[in-house]
Protein backbone atom coordinates (compact mmCIF):
# COMPACT_ATOMS: atom_id res chain seq x y z
CA UNK A 1 0.00 0.00 0.00
CA UNK A 2 1.35 3.33 -1.04
CA UNK A 3 1.73 5.71 1.87
CA UNK A 4 0.90 9.35 1.59
CA UNK A 5 4.01 11.10 2.89
CA UNK A 6 3.95 14.84 3.04
CA UNK A 7 6.95 16.74 4.21
CA UNK A 8 5.66 20.09 5.30
CA UNK A 9 7.70 22.13 7.65
CA UNK A 10 7.00 23.51 11.05
CA UNK A 11 8.94 26.71 10.89
CA UNK A 12 10.29 28.93 13.58
CA UNK A 13 9.43 32.48 12.54
CA UNK A 14 11.84 35.37 12.68
CA UNK A 15 10.49 36.04 16.18
CA UNK A 16 11.21 32.40 17.08
CA UNK A 17 7.57 31.26 17.30
CA UNK A 18 6.90 27.81 15.87
CA UNK A 19 4.86 27.80 12.69
CA UNK A 20 3.55 25.13 10.42
CA UNK A 21 4.11 25.84 6.74
CA UNK A 22 1.23 24.03 5.09
CA UNK A 23 -0.41 25.12 1.86
CA UNK A 24 -3.82 23.58 2.52
CA UNK A 25 -3.79 23.58 6.31
CA UNK A 26 -2.99 20.88 8.77
CA UNK A 27 -3.93 17.42 7.62
CA UNK A 28 -4.62 15.27 10.63
CA UNK A 29 -3.88 11.58 10.71
CA UNK A 30 -6.61 9.10 11.58
CA UNK A 31 -4.50 5.99 12.07
CA UNK A 32 -3.15 5.90 15.61
CA UNK A 33 0.46 4.70 15.98
CA UNK A 34 -0.77 1.62 17.85
CA UNK A 35 -2.75 0.63 14.73
CA UNK A 36 -0.30 1.53 11.95
CA UNK A 37 1.54 4.44 10.37
CA UNK A 38 0.11 7.98 10.49
CA UNK A 39 -1.15 9.07 7.06
CA UNK A 40 0.23 12.61 7.17
CA UNK A 41 3.73 13.34 8.41
CA UNK A 42 5.57 16.63 8.73
CA UNK A 43 9.07 17.83 9.59
CA UNK A 44 9.78 20.73 11.94
CA UNK A 45 12.18 23.45 10.83
CA UNK A 46 13.10 26.94 12.04
CA UNK A 47 13.80 30.01 9.92
CA UNK A 48 17.56 29.33 10.03
CA UNK A 49 17.17 25.89 8.45
CA UNK A 50 17.46 23.77 11.59
CA UNK A 51 15.08 20.82 11.82
CA UNK A 52 13.85 18.99 14.90
CA UNK A 53 15.55 15.66 15.47
CA UNK A 54 13.92 12.76 17.32
CA UNK A 55 14.35 14.53 20.68
CA UNK A 56 13.06 17.86 19.20
CA UNK A 57 16.60 19.29 19.38
CA UNK A 58 17.97 21.19 16.36
CA UNK A 59 19.78 19.44 13.51
CA UNK A 60 20.89 20.22 9.95
CA UNK A 61 21.68 16.56 9.24
CA UNK A 62 18.97 15.37 6.82
CA UNK A 63 19.35 11.83 8.13
CA UNK A 64 18.25 13.03 11.57
CA UNK A 65 15.13 15.01 10.61
CA UNK A 66 12.26 13.71 12.72
CA UNK A 67 8.75 13.27 11.35
CA UNK A 68 5.63 14.36 13.23
CA UNK A 69 1.92 13.66 12.85
CA UNK A 70 -1.02 15.70 14.11
CA UNK A 71 -4.18 14.27 15.63
CA UNK A 72 -7.28 16.34 16.27
CA UNK A 73 -8.77 16.75 19.70
CA UNK A 74 -12.28 17.72 20.78
CA UNK A 75 -11.36 21.42 20.88
CA UNK A 76 -11.17 23.52 17.70
CA UNK A 77 -7.63 24.38 16.52
CA UNK A 78 -6.21 21.99 19.11
CA UNK A 79 -4.07 18.96 18.30
CA UNK A 80 -2.02 16.17 19.77
CA UNK A 81 1.46 15.94 18.22
CA UNK A 82 3.06 12.53 17.69
CA UNK A 83 6.80 12.19 17.05
CA UNK A 84 6.78 9.40 14.44
CA UNK A 85 10.57 9.02 14.53
CA UNK A 86 10.85 8.65 18.31
CA UNK A 87 7.50 6.83 18.57
CA UNK A 88 6.50 9.24 21.33
CA UNK A 89 3.79 11.83 21.95
CA UNK A 90 4.64 15.43 22.81
CA UNK A 91 3.65 16.45 26.33
CA UNK A 92 4.39 19.16 28.86
CA UNK A 93 3.64 19.93 32.48
CA UNK A 94 0.53 22.07 32.42
CA UNK A 95 0.74 25.13 34.70
CA UNK A 96 -1.22 28.30 35.39
CA UNK A 97 1.36 30.29 33.40
CA UNK A 98 4.67 29.74 31.63
CA UNK A 99 7.97 31.57 31.35
CA UNK A 100 10.54 31.41 28.53
CA UNK A 101 12.65 28.28 28.96
CA UNK A 102 14.54 25.46 27.30
CA UNK A 103 13.55 21.81 27.61
CA UNK A 104 9.80 22.43 28.00
CA UNK A 105 8.54 19.57 25.83
CA UNK A 106 8.46 16.00 27.15
CA UNK A 107 8.24 12.86 25.04
CA UNK A 108 5.80 10.26 26.41
CA UNK A 109 4.77 6.77 25.34
CA UNK A 110 0.98 6.88 25.57
CA UNK A 111 -1.51 9.28 23.99
CA UNK A 112 -3.30 9.45 27.34
CA UNK A 113 -0.17 11.19 28.70
CA UNK A 114 0.14 13.56 25.72
CA UNK A 115 -0.76 17.24 25.91
CA UNK A 116 -2.96 19.19 23.55
CA UNK A 117 -1.53 22.26 21.87
CA UNK A 118 -3.29 25.15 20.22
CA UNK A 119 -2.21 25.60 16.61
CA UNK A 120 -3.17 28.91 15.04
CA UNK A 121 -2.67 30.13 11.48
CA UNK A 122 -0.77 33.40 11.56
CA UNK A 123 -0.06 34.27 7.90
CA UNK A 124 0.53 32.75 4.48
CA UNK A 125 -0.21 29.20 5.57
CA UNK A 126 2.08 29.43 8.60
CA UNK A 127 0.99 28.30 12.03
CA UNK A 128 2.20 28.81 15.61
CA UNK A 129 2.02 26.20 18.36
CA UNK A 130 1.06 27.11 21.92
CA UNK A 131 0.78 24.89 24.99
CA UNK A 132 -2.38 25.32 27.05
CA UNK A 133 -2.26 26.59 30.61
CA UNK A 134 -4.18 24.84 33.38
CA UNK A 135 -6.84 27.55 32.83
CA UNK A 136 -7.32 26.36 29.23
CA UNK A 137 -5.63 29.34 27.58
CA UNK A 138 -3.09 29.05 24.76
CA UNK A 139 0.07 30.49 26.28
CA UNK A 140 3.48 31.44 24.90
CA UNK A 141 5.03 29.65 21.92
CA UNK A 142 7.21 26.59 21.25
CA UNK A 143 10.74 27.34 20.05
CA UNK A 144 14.43 26.81 20.79
CA UNK A 145 14.67 29.45 23.51
CA UNK A 146 18.03 31.28 23.35
CA UNK A 147 18.61 29.87 19.85
CA UNK A 148 20.79 27.02 18.64
CA UNK A 149 24.03 26.80 20.58
CA UNK A 150 25.05 26.16 24.18
CA UNK A 151 21.47 26.00 25.49
CA UNK A 152 20.14 24.01 22.50
CA UNK A 153 23.09 22.13 20.98
CA UNK A 154 22.84 20.84 17.44
CA UNK A 155 22.08 17.10 17.41
CA UNK A 156 21.56 17.25 21.16
CA UNK A 157 18.85 16.07 23.50
CA UNK A 158 17.41 19.34 24.87
CA UNK A 159 13.74 19.43 23.90
CA UNK A 160 11.82 22.40 22.52
CA UNK A 161 11.36 25.33 24.85
CA UNK A 162 9.11 28.40 25.08
CA UNK A 163 9.31 32.04 24.03
CA UNK A 164 6.91 34.96 24.44
CA UNK A 165 6.74 36.42 20.91
CA UNK A 166 4.33 35.07 18.33
CA UNK A 167 5.11 34.56 14.67
CA UNK A 168 3.68 37.81 13.32
PLM region spans:
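Sec-dependent, cleavable N-terminal signal peptides
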Residues: 1-26
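Lectin-like carbohydrate-binding module/patch detector with strong preference for beta-trefoil
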Residues: 24-168
